[in-house]
Structure formats: structure tokens, C-alpha cells
Amino acid sequence: MFDIGLNLTSPQFANDRDDVVARAFAAGVKGLLLTGTNLHESEHAQQLAQGYERCWSTAGVHPHDSSQWTDESAETLYKLAKTEEVVAIGECGLDFNRNFSTPVEQEAAFTAQLAIAAELEMPVFMHCRDAHERFLTLLEPWRDKLPGAVLHCFTGSRQEAVECLNRGLYLGITGWVCDERRGLELRELLPVIPADRLLVETDAPYLLPRDMKPKPASRRNEPAYLGHIVERIAHWRGEERQRLDAQTDENVRRLFGITF
């Protein structure tokens, strides 16, 4: 199993990053993709990935930080993308739930990053919240120019999942699916996702699975808990855990072009 969404740059991991990574590998995680959410965090994620085995990173500007996007941002992403650790452009996309950056700023930054990914022939690591239709509209002209794309931390409806899958996207599933309050719809649509389009992630330190027993002493999520998420996904999909592990690992290799 491979965690495609770990925010290892988070201050919540500042005091024990080495231990967090070690616990993940001890728990059977085979690799980690460290998320870059703005230019500073993307540089930090690349540096962290450089320091650990079986770690890679993304480089991009999250919709929350889109107001910071400039021509210099593109130059920084080009530079980071040339490094061996960076295997995807992102996290980029749209978030109309909070609008920490205006919709206009978000759309400009998203489109610019899609263009960079297409030019560099790199996959895209994407975010979408409360912006499904506009997200697909902006993505559409670039679909055939991208080698692949994943919508990480998918929490949408069955119809939204089908529309994303019909456009060739991979879907990243987190511990949100373990939440008996908010995750029931996601749980029910899991069988809709073809095995060769499913990716798994923790989005740690966020989204600690609510159904872990015993509950961890800390509310901080960790990549070491990925196995619990995968176990639950396999159960709700009616699949064998080992088969799901093997398939999602193969999906990671295919999408990101990495070996682990």
C-alpha cells in the first residue's frame, strides 16, 4: 500500500517526522507522496522527500493559496519539476467552499498549473470542493494533453464520481470514508470505482479515521494508519485486502511513473 497524500510539511509533524515515516514503513506502507500546497511547502516537501527512501513529492499551489500565484510561481514549479523527487504538479484545483482566494484567482492558478503539467508531460494532483462543474469545465481542454490526473481526497456524490471517472481521472480515497456521520455516501459508492482507478491516502495529519479501535491517544492522523483505511475500503468494496493492496500499488506506479 502506498499513501498518495501525506502533508509531512505540516507543523504537526515538526517534532517527530523521522518517527512518523518510520512508523509508516513499519506498518507496511511501501511509499509516501508528500503534498506541496504552495511554493514554500512544495520546496519543503521536495527537500523532505530527498531525505527519505521511498518518498516522493508534488509541487503546486492549492486553491486556498491561489492569490499568491505570479509568473515567478510558474518558474519555481518548473525548477522543482526537474528534480527527481517531484512526480506530479499540484495540489491544484478549485475550492469554492471557503474561497480563501477568489474564484477568479483560483481558476487562473489552476489553469496555469494544468498548462505546466501538460507541457512537462506530468500527472496532476488535484483538489475540488463545492466546484465540481466548473472544475470539470476548466480541466476538459487539458485532459488529452495530460498523462494522468488524480482527484485527491474525493468526497463527492456518486454522480460526481461517475463524471470524474468518465473523464479518465483516478480517485483518492481517505479516512473520510470511515466517518459514520459524513462518509456514508462515499462508502456506498466505493464499488463504482474501477479497481484500476482507485488510490488510497491518509491526508495526514488531517482526517483521522473515526472508527479506529482502540482510538489513538492523539487526534493527529498518521500514514501508519493507512492500513486501517485500506482494510475498511476492501470490506466495503467486497474485495480481498491483498488484491486491493496490489492493485492500488500498480495504479501508483502507472500514474506517477515511480518504482517501489
From Swiss-Prot:
GO cellular component: cytosol
Cofactor: Mg(2+)
Main location (coarse class): cytoplasm
Keywords from the UniProt entry: Cytoplasm, Exonuclease, Hydrolase, Magnesium, Metal-binding, Nuclease
PROSITE patterns for the chain: TATD_2, TATD_3
Keyword Ribonucleoprotein: no
Keyword Metal-binding assigned: yes
Cell compartments where the protein resides: Cytoplasm
Binding site for a divalent metal cation: 91, 127, 152
EC category: hydrolase
Superkingdom in the source lineage: Bacteria
EC number: 3.1.11.-, 3.1.13.-
GO molecular function: 3'-5'-RNA exonuclease activity; magnesium ion binding; single-stranded DNA 3'-5' DNA exonuclease activity
InterPro entries for this protein: DNase_TatD-rel_CS, Exonuc_TatD, Metal_Hydrolase, TatD-like, TatD/YcfH-like
NCBIfam families the UniProt entry points to: PRK10425.1, YchF/TatD family DNA exonuclease
Protein task: 3'-5' exonuclease that prefers single-stranded DNA and RNA. May play a role in the H(2)O(2)-induced DNA damage repair.
HAMAP family: TatD_exonuclease
Assembly with partners or alone: Monomer.
PANTHER family for the chain: D-AMINOACYL-TRNA DEACYLASE
This protein's name: 3'-5' ssDNA/RNA exonuclease TatD
Species whose genome carries this gene: Enterobacter sp. (strain 638)
